[in-house]
From Swiss-Prot:
Name this polypeptide is given: Phosphate acyltransferase
Oligomer status and interactors: Homodimer. Probably interacts with PlsY.
Species for this entry: Fervidobacterium nodosum (strain ATCC 35602 / DSM 5306 / Rt17-B1)
UniProtKB keywords: Cytoplasm, Lipid biosynthesis, Lipid metabolism, Phospholipid biosynthesis, Phospholipid metabolism, Transferase
Main location: cytoplasm
Gene Ontology CC terms, in alphabetical order: cytoplasm
A molecular function (GO) term: phosphate:acyl-[acyl carrier protein] acyltransferase activity
Compartmental location: Cytoplasm
GN (gene name): plsX
Primary enzyme class: transferase
Family under the similarity heading: Belongs to the PlsX family.
Amino acid sequence: MIRIALDLMGGDRAPEEIKAGALMYLQNVKKTGRKVQLVLVGLADTLKEFEHFKSEGLVELVEAQEALPMDVKPTDALRRKNSSMYIASQLVKEKKAEAIVSAGNTGALLSCATLVVGRLPGVDRPALAVPVPSLNDFTILIDAGANAEVKHEWLIQFAAMGIEYAKILGKRNPKVGLLNVGTEENKGTELEKQAYQLLKQAFNESFYGNVEGNDINIGTVDVVVTNGFSGNIAMKTMEGVAKLISHTIKQEAKKSLDGILGALLFSRTLKKLKKKLDPRTYGGSFFLGVDGIVVKAHGNSDRIAIYNAIDVAVRGVEGKLVEQLNERLKVYNK
């Protein structure tokens, strides 16, 4: 039985959309018979409607005393041990759950992941890894928002985790690139210049060199490493462009008979495109480098995104992501 701790109180749309996503997932579990139990952590009044699932063994209800606001400081998150996020993290630490899913504040979840759940050996800072759609299937963007400021040695660890994550997802001999304002070796701040040399030494032929923002979706490399500040801006920009494309196609299809006929003719293709570009499809992203599965859902997640975030966590447990990553990182820690 896989046990997933879900923070019902985290996110811009909490608790209603988080609860709705949990209900959707529970219905799927009942239908498919998957061996998954949700450990729902929230304020007392948010847990009531899940009581009837207890007799079926589909849920465990854990009461929290408070919800962390979305603007909470990471250090405050660690002090508020009665919050839903902290309690859910503690459940993973104590092996009472295999994973935590939260749409709460990223910095707060990073603090809980790092200092409550704990880090893998040799990892200084966990990082948010996002598989981004590309012309070459996908590109791993790491860090996508966890660490706004980084040290150049952290970027080496991010690259190592990104490479091994890409291998787990099926990439053979993945190439890593450093996000920069140009491809020349001398581009960027001192941080990027130092990181470039260290990446070159550490990964040899696996290091492609500097890459630019457009290379992420082109798929020039399999892993793009950067600080969380630049990574988050890049990710949010791509989300905005995806919405623009979807909206433009929809609007143009309505303007003429040719557009309507074209939309009907290519409806299946357009649906696939929309699904691929929709951030909700991917649900959530892993904090890599943590000694447990920690999935960060988008702060603005709706029920569909939460459903998919839970599924991401389940697949992470089933695929033994933490165990594989821990084993693969040993080569870098010698």
